[in-house]
Amino acid sequence: MALYLRLPATAGFNIDNELIIINAFNANEPEQSLHGKDVNIIASGPSIQQLPLTELLDTPTIFVNGSISLIGQHQFTDIAGYVISDARFINHQPEILQQYYTGQPLYATLAVFEAMATTHPDIMRTYHHAMRVLYPVDRPWGVKSNKLSFNKLIFKKKLLNKKIPLSYFINNPNFIIDSDHKAADIGVSLNITHGFVEAGTVAYVAAQLAFSRQAASIHLYGIDLLNSKQPRFYENKNNSAPSMLSKVLNERIVPSFNLLGRIYQSHGVPVVNHSPISKSLFDTF
């Protein structure tokens, strides 16, 4: 039997000589349950601009990266979460957190929180109780920033930085791993208390979070994919961050979402892609 790395239950960050503790996500926490409600995940594709958002405002909603800026124009009544999985977002769009984050449930990787400890220390101090750490199962540290070197996390990073092949988790009951996929192994988590599987887009992380929190159905908006060279709805041509989606679209993102849709449907949780741009790419939802 494989011995799996025990993920830390908390992470401590040294911010101006003050220890800030953030708990890891645990699906058994009562406040994490979505109580069998339908959940919308709103990504950042340009199609969001054509979305009738007024029809979605009362449904539990999980935002990712810059889509949280929608709360500046629309009154969402049930913000179920905000997910950031790549620290590069923090460095490229720091003003979004500063302007729109006011203590909503935030789920992010260690690398993201370490970036925030440097760029947004006041936010970390004020709202750390509303934050939860998510661990990528194959590299628990997460996607680090290219631009800055951070050293705020207090425990040693060596084990968490080690890349682990997904095939290592093939017999772990918390994951479904497809090792027959020709490009590279893909997978999906059934409970991200034990880690999430990456697929090249933060929306994939958010979908695993929604399932782990007992959503009845998962509705995806703004996952456009095919027009990834266009600015996100909150960007313009002058400030748009580079997108890696086109590079991994057919090899990783689409097969992973098809696996996720198939597995979650088999557990009674349908996944629906509402993007008019990418809907035709998927064969399971």
State the predicted function of each range:
Residues 1-285:
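Metal-ion/cofactor- or nucleotide/acyl-coenzyme-handling active-site neighborhoods
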